[in-house]
Design a protein with these regions (language model features):
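Bacterial N-terminal signal peptides
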Residues: 23-35
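Alpha-helical transmembrane segments and their juxtamembrane interfaces
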Residues: 13-15, 32-35, 118
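N-terminal secretory signal peptides that target proteins for export/translocation
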Residues: 1-21
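Boundary at the C-terminal end of the N-terminal hydrophobic targeting segment
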Residues: 38-43
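Interaction/scaffold regions that mediate signaling and macromolecular assembly across diverse proteins
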Residues: 44-91, 97-102, 111-268
Length: 268
């Protein structure tokens, strides 16, 4: 399961203590921990609401980002990133859907924060220009009290613990060929619907960033290289794709080139 911090009761050498004292101390410990989680949750609500509203304002219909708007309102992004740092945010007693939604949101928020940190008035052209071309390996983020990199979130926390291939339509690496960002945060209650919608946006909506049909009958297809990179997560990715598309079966003739240009909205 996820590598989260857990509080433990330490038994000291030197003889048994009166059970009443031990019970009292344990009760104080548990109450304090519960109050801490409640306080963190209350802070989360306000930060999440403001951040979700900003996403709705800063994204267009293709999921491309108005980065100047995010730069102007980076305080909202910072507050949400700070909220993600709270110890216990990924507590093991939470439902799996809650933890997965939090991990997806964290990956995407940290990526946006990385871009606005280096946006440089629009001169940044690609996330691959940062950290020697390997920004995903830098453990510069704090999630649930732990320092992590984007790659650790994706591979160690998500892929190793959740059998959910649709996460590849939800994790957004700030590139033109990445899946579209949503105009909202992922939530435990709506996660299945949200992931299904992301899958439709990638596989069914005719966006040539992800799938291009060729031939007179449009049954030959070039598809996103995400299938090439993460094919094992989908099982038989060819069958996976065809089962989710209406009409005649597609023949997959190759992978599209991945476009690492920034997923920014075109300048007006």
């Amino acid at each position: 399961m996820l590598d989260v911090e857990q509080s433990t009761v330490v038994h000291h050498a030197g003889g048994a203590r009166p059970r009443l004292i031990e019970a009292g101390r344990l009760l104080v410990f548990l109450v304090a921990g519960t109050m801490g989680f409640a306080a963190a949750g209350q802070e989360t609500d306000d930060a999440s609401r403001a951040y979700g509203e900003l996403l709705a304002q800063a994204l267009d219909g293709r999921g491309l980002v108005d980065y100047p708007r995010l730069v102007d309102r980076r305080g909202v992004v910072d507050a949400y990133v700070d909220r993600l740092a709270a110890p216990g945010l990924l507590h093991e007693q939470q439902p799996e859907a809650q933890r997965l939604a939090t991990l997806i949101n964290a990956y995407n928020a940290f990526t946006l924060r990385l871009i606005i940190d280096h946006y440089d008035a629009g001169r940044l052209s690609s996330i691959t220009d940062l950290h020697g071309g390997k920004p995903w390996d830098v453990a510069e983020w704090t999630l649930s009290g732990q320092r992590v990199s984007l790659n650790q979130i994706e591979h160690e926390h998500i892929r190793e613990n959740f059998n959910e291939p649709r996460i590849h339509w939800a994790l957004v690496c700030a590139a033109w060929s990445c899946p579209p960002l949503r105009h909202e945060l992922y939530t435990a209650e709506d996660l299945d619907r949200q992931l299904a919608d992301q899958e439709r946006r990638v596989l069914l909506k005719g966006d040539r960033r992800f799938i291009q049909l060729e031939g007179d009958d449009e049954t030959a297809a070039r598809v996103t290289p995400l299938f090439e990179w993460y094919g094992q997560d989908f099982g038989n990715w060819r069958e996976y794709s065809n089962q989710r598309r209406p009409g005649p079966r597609l023949r997959f003739v190759g992978f599209l080139d991945y476009d690492w240009r920034l997923n920014a909205q075109p300048s007006p």
